């Protein structure tokens, strides 16, 4: 039942007022992000961004950012894959400061995750962080991760990075990227 309930949180949240969503939906989602069943946590990871769209960025930072960080650090690879796939969207929602302080340490861990599928999921979306972080933070924080992922032993990881290079190019420029 919990598994099926998670699938409807975003839909219900969009029908409620923001205050009702904060008081009724977010506490349940936060609780389910710690559920003993990895499948429930997986569904929360898939739906969390859509639920967060129903409330303000400040509420997301206060209420849901800790839940998202927990999902990024989950013991199950499937949960990490699902949450890593939403990292760019979530960072756009919370902004550069919260992304650097809370999410970027998780991204650094995921870039060297033992699961190649987690690294591939991250590589598919990590380039989308460049516009959120801006030129300086992209150069300082993300460029080393891009380079590490470009050297990954798993070809899907490298392919995902290469296919998204245009997003970084728009932020830091071709000259720096080609170095």
Identify what each model region corresponds to.
Residues 7-11, 27, 46-50, 66, ...:
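Residue-level signature of alpha-solenoid helical repeat scaffolds
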């Amino acid at each position: 039942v919990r598994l099926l309930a998670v699938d409807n949180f975003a839909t219900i949240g969009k029908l409620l007022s923001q205050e009702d969503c904060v008081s009724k939906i977010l506490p349940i989602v936060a609780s389910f992000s710690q559920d003993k069943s990895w499948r429930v946590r997986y569904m929360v990871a898939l739906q969390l961004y859509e639920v967060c769209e129903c409330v303000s960025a400040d509420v997301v930072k206060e209420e849901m950012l800790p839940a998202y960080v927990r999902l990024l650090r989950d013991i199950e690879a499937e949960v990490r894959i699902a949450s890593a796939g939403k990292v760019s969207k979530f960072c756009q929602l919370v902004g550069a400061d919260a992304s650097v302080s809370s999410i970027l340490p998780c991204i650094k861990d995921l870039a060297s995750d033992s699961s190649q599928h987690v690294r591939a999921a991250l590589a598919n979306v990590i380039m989308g962080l460049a516009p959120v972080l801006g030129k300086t933070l992209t150069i300082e924080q993300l460029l080393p991760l891009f380079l590490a992922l470009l050297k990954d032993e798993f070809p899907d990881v490298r392919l995902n990075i290469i296919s998204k290079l245009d997003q970084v190019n728009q932020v830091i420029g071709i000259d720096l990227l080609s170095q």
